[in-house]
Design a protein with these regions (language model features):
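Conserved alpha-helical scaffold flanking the Walker A/P-loop in AAA+ ATPase domains
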Residues: 49, 106-125
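Walker A/P-loop
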Residues: 55-91
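Canonical AAA+ ATPase core
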Residues: 106-111, 132, 136, 144-221, ...
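Walker B catalytic acidic pair
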Residues: 127-128, 139
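Conserved AAA+ ATPase small/helical "lid" subdomain
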Residues: 216-268
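Single conserved hydrophobic/aromatic residue that forms the stacking wall/gate
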Residues: 299-310
Length: 310
């Protein structure tokens, strides 16, 4: 998918009935892609998919081997989007309190003080989430769902926007365990970056020689811009026929002998949000069935059954 590039002038805006706010989101998205592609070479499609997820208000799961640029992607996004960023390596000894935070007694004031966990930031990279304990995984996924943490009876809200990019090693790698479906359902998409092609890897090597670090990524969008963009996406028009089409597709995944677990109602809502974001980045203020099909290909759906694998 490519972002629609015909909506760059006011004349074309009027001809295609996009509002100024919608055009601003289009131009903002293109600016973010231009910055991130400085360090993530040859992966524009992945950048767009992650951007769609952010506009749809979802969290992202990236499954891939180490070294393909997952951390670099998260850092570059945080810089381009002007977001605070934290990373936590989910080793087996990571505790839930490392994620959510804890209270500690201040010996000088004799009062308990809250020490923030790693998850309390705008963009949180949960690295190798399938290498840690189920209890620690649950702590993070609860934060993702609720948008807040409660420690010793006191609730602390996540900053807004709040985005989690979690990575996991391929199933079967040493020291890993599969995330339960109930936890996978918290992610709006499940992506794989893959190896770069020949031309992209050569360009990457040349850029490393010329010392083009992530620090060269410029902030082009503010946190407030992201929140406003989400409101614009929410207002994209969806007809009754498309609503019915979304539910029909969801039901098709639930009654498919080749899929272990179909799209949940929460997944259907996520599909609607992704569909709206897709329509806007394609240059429309309304959704068509093709947007639904494209978005459904990104939304996380359960693993195939054994029969499907055969």
């Amino acid at each position: 998918m490519k972002i629609k590039e015909t909506y760059k002038t006011k004349e074309k805006i009027m001809n295609n009935s996009l509002t100024e706010e919608q055009v601003k989101v289009l131009n903002m998205s293109q600016s973010v892609i231009n910055e991130v592609r400085k360090v993530i070479i040859g992966k524009d499609e992945i950048i767009i998919k992650v951007l769609l997820s952010i506009l749809a208000g979802g969290h992202i799961l990236i499954e891939d081997i180490p070294g393909v640029g997952k951390t670099t992607l998260a850092v570059a996004l945080s810089k381009a989007l002007s977001l605070d960023y934290k990373r936590l390596q989910f080793t087996p000894d990571v505790l839930p309190t490392d994620v959510t935070g804890f209270t500690i007694l201040n010996k000088e004031t004799h009062k308990f003080e809250y020490k923030q966990g790693a998850a309390l930031t705008n963009l949180f990279l949960a690295d190798e989430i399938n290498r840690t304990s189920s209890k620690t995984q649950s702590a993070l996924l609860e934060v993702m769902e609720e948008g807040k943490v409660t420690v010793d009876g006191i609730t602390h809200k996540m900053p807004d926007p709040y985005i989690v990019i979690a990575t996991q090693n391929p199933v079967g790698s040493i020291g890993t365990q599969m995330l339960p479906e109930s936890q996978m359902d918290r992610f709006i998409v499940r992506l794989t970056m893959g190896y770069p092609n020949l031309e992209s890897e050569v360009a990457m090597l040349k850029s490393k020689q010329n010392l083009v670090p992530v620090d060269n990524v410029r902030p082009v969008v503010s946190a407030e811009d992201i929140l406003q963009a989400r409101k614009v996406v929410e207002n994209i028009y969806v007809s009754d026929q498309v609503f019915q089409y979304i539910v029909m597709l969801a039901n098709a995944t639930r009654n498919n002998e080749y899929i272990k677990l179909g799209l949940s109602p929460r997944g259907t809502i996520a599909l609607l949000r992704m569909t709206k974001a897709t329509a806007l980045l394609k240059g429309r203020d309304y959704v068509i069935p093709d947007d639904v099909i494209y978005s459904l290909s990104l939304i996380h759906i359960s693993e195939p059954t054994r029969q499907a694998e055969i």
